[in-house]
Amino acid sequence: MEESARCSAASHIAGHILHRCDQSDASFCISLFGGLKNEPDFLPLVLPEIVAAASCAAFFQIEGNELRPRQVRSMDDLQRGAMNVWEPKAHCPSVPVSSLDIILVPGLAFTRGGLRLGRGGGFYDRLLAHPDCRARRIGIAYDLQIIDDIPCEPHDQRVHQIITETGLIDASPNG
């Protein structure tokens, strides 16, 4: 995908994320991600508005083989961490997994049924399988990342919805 098309798609994705947040309860906690070159770069477009609208905006600190949510209030609370992704700085307070209402989930590919192809580390699968995780799982992808089939293992966790540049897909195990 060319840079101009990627920027345009990221802008549309940002708009869909903000629209989804507008439909959420007044006090919600959302986790975000960003940083890898081939991922939609929506972060600068949504973070200020999400921080203003949400009761909590969180990013994940990689600790061992786990993702630990921490609250951020601006881009100043972020730094490049493991794998060059945005991570919260040490001063950012921890957020219990049970407090997360929405988790934006990256992936290399998704199916309309909510299956996700990650990068092989299992970080998001472990997070989403956490017994305290009751959050709405929303995959973030470009349209070209929506494919027909992904091999599935018992530990793989599905997303409930997928946001692309053209809108929201309600994931269904039969879809």
Model-derived regions, located:
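N-terminal active-site beta-alpha-beta segment that forms phosphate/nucleotide-binding
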Residues: 1-98
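Conserved phosphate- and dinucleotide-binding cores of soluble alpha/beta proteins
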Residues: 65-175
